[in-house]
């Protein structure tokens, strides 16, 4: 066989190998898409690396907020949060969650994280995976016209992973029923460390519920 007879064969082999790689790549992409869709359908949050921002503005503090599932929409809960002014953490640029008042006098603030309630003595309750909780960070909230110290926030209902809340008064039984505003354990630790550093605190004000508190 002459040398030139090999050229089509080599070309065919190269095209075949390239085609196999393309099919494998498409299968990998399809698998990732299916995993994301399945996670969303099951109510799971796909982890993403969030950047912390240090803000000073009015905000809603939901670290211990009680929440009630929204009628007709089990994926959302309505939470009653405190309106605060001062340093806080968010995972979007501060201007994105800047408070505002519309032409009708309706005041909008956003749920952001702060250490204030822990400094006031609230302790951190850890709850097991599978129990319902709400994720309020960065969510828009409407300030109560009858009580400007309170805001109503619409938060996501989740049942993923171990989570914490400053609500519940250390009563673990409420983890299954109360729909507390909470946070994933790792995110809470990361946010706490960030604020301690930004505020130049000597130590964190966070205290945890003890085994003796369980009931």
Model-derived segments and spans:
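Short hydrophobic alpha-helices and adjacent helix-cap/hinge residues
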Residues: 1-25
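Enrichment for repetitive, rod-forming helical segments
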Residues: 9-10, 39, 114, 207
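Sec/Tat signal peptide C-region and signal peptidase I cleavage site
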Residues: 44-50
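Bacterial N-terminal signal peptides
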Residues: 13, 34-43
């Amino acid at each position: 066989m002459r040398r030139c007879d090999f050229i089509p064969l080599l070309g065919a082999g190269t095209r075949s190998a390239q085609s196999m790689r393309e099919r494998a790549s498409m299968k990998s992409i399809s698998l990732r898409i299916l995993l994301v869709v399945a996670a969303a359908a099951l109510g799971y949050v796909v982890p993403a690396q969030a950047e912390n921002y240090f803000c000073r503005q009015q905000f809603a503090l939901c670290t211990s907020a009680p929440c009630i599932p929204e009628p007709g929409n089990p994926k959302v809960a309505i939470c009653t949060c405190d309106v605060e002014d001062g340093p806080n953490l968010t995972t979007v640029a501060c201007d994105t969650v800047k408070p505002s008042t519309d032409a009708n006098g309706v005041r909008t603030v956003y749920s952001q994280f702060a250490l204030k309630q822990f400094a006031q003595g609230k302790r951190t309750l850890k709850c097991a995976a599978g129990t319902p909780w709400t994720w309020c960070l960065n969510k828009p909230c409407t300030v109560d016209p009858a009580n400007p110290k309170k805001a109503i926030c619409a938060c996501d209902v989740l049942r993923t992973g171990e989570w914490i809340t400053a609500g519940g008064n250390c009563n673990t039984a409420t983890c299954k029923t109360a729909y507390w505003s909470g946070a994933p354990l790792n995110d809470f630790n990361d946010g706490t460390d960030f604020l301690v550093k930004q505020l130049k605190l000597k130590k964190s004000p966070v205290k945890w519920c003890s085994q003796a508190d369980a009931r």
